[in-house]
Design a protein with these regions (language model features):
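Pre-Walker A adenine-sensing motif
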Residues: 79-96
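Mid-core helix/loop region of P-loop NTP-binding domains shared across ATPases and GTPases
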Residues: 136-137, 142, 151-189, 195-201, ...
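C-terminal alpha-helical "lid" subdomain
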Residues: 1-59, 63, 222-223, 233-236, ...
Length: 305
């Protein structure tokens, strides 16, 4: 190998980067994108023919490899059987069985999205759509079309007809996460097209403002409100649920450690999971086997609560 290249770094990089057929974890294209280079640069580096600034490239590679090592060591918190998951499961089941509309609301961090993804993973018939503030009626219908495997090209009317045809008679339920971002007309489109015309159950999930939006009589949502058969309101994380989540990672910790975690998380599932991740990082740095109050306090200082 040329003296221009760091042989050890080169070997370490290509132990991770390459094709899946070679058993590599990350493709050259993804590595190039992460590093801010073209695929051609990585190919040239692999063949030791790169004639650009090798030192700068290798500095970026070294820093990226360290970040990847940290990512691999990130704590994977198993999905626990919480009351939020059970409530969502019940609401979705009713909506699907009865072809009804269900609304699930909860503050940010109550575990809605995690529970929905878990339900969609368990179910063979749930269609999960995660919307964002940029979604228009057209974007929404195109996303639904893609999710159910129908052609989303062409005018909106054509896409709507394909969606109706595909869903009619199909044992399915459409779950829309972050539905509070949808406009009034998009919510009405879901009611008319998905629920009315295709007779498919719909579950709208979002922040509490979703309920206010639907109930607002200044908007033409009376028909939507009258179709809602289930309304679920998720509260703060319950102590028993928090213990289940923590015990999924650290079994047999003292009661006071559970209490410290719960107090620091302040009723938020998302905060608890992030807190556990930071605790795991600090434990690794301190070579600790179990979490303690001092580590939890240090981890809590890194979170916005």
């Amino acid at each position: 190998m040329s003296d221009l290249f760091d042989g050890e770094l080169y070997k370490k990089f290509f132990e991770v980067v390459g094709s899946p057929e070679e058993g590599k974890r990350i493709s050259q294209a993804k590595a190039a994108q992460a590093l801010g280079y073209s695929g051609g640069v990585i190919s040239a580096y692999k063949s030791q023919a790169y004639n650009g600034d090798v030192k700068t490239l290798e500095k970026k590679i070294a820093a990226w490899l360290k970040r990847e090592e940290r990512r691999l060591d990130r704590l994977d918190v198993p999905v626990a059987e919480t009351s939020a998951l059970e409530k969502i499961r019940r609401a979705v089941t009713i909506a699907q069985d009865e072809g009804d509309i269900a609304v699930v609301i909860g503050d940010s961090g109550t575990g809605k999205t995690t529970a929905l993804r878990q339900y969609a993973k368990e179910s063979h018939s749930a269609i999960l759509i995660e919307v964002d503030p940029s979604f228009s009626q057209v974007t929404l219908m195109n996303e639904i079309a893609r999710a159910i495997g129908v052609d989303h090209k062409g005018g909106q009317n054509a896409v709507v007809e394909r969606v109706i045809e595909s869903l009619t008679g199909r044992d399915a339920v459409l779950i829309v996460d972050e539905a509070d971002y949808l406009s009034d007309s998009s919510l009405e489109l879901l009611r008319r097209v998905i629920n009315d015309k295709s007779k498919t159950g719909v579950v709208l999930v979002g922040l509490p403002r979703l309920e206010f939006k639907i109930r607002n009589l200044k908007n033409d949502h009376q028909q939507l409100q009258s179709r809602i058969g289930v309304l679920v309101k998720l509260g703060k994380l319950k102590k028993a649920d928090a213990i289940s989540i923590i015990a999924g990672v650290w079994k047999g910790v003292p009661t006071q450690i559970f209490d410290t975690f719960i107090q620091t998380a302040n009723g938020s599932t998302r905060t608890l999971v992030k807190l556990m991740g930071r605790v795991h990082q600090i434990m690794g740095l301190n070579k600790a086997n179990t979490p303690d109050a001092e580590i939890i306090a240090e981890a809590g200082e890194l979170l916005m609560r």
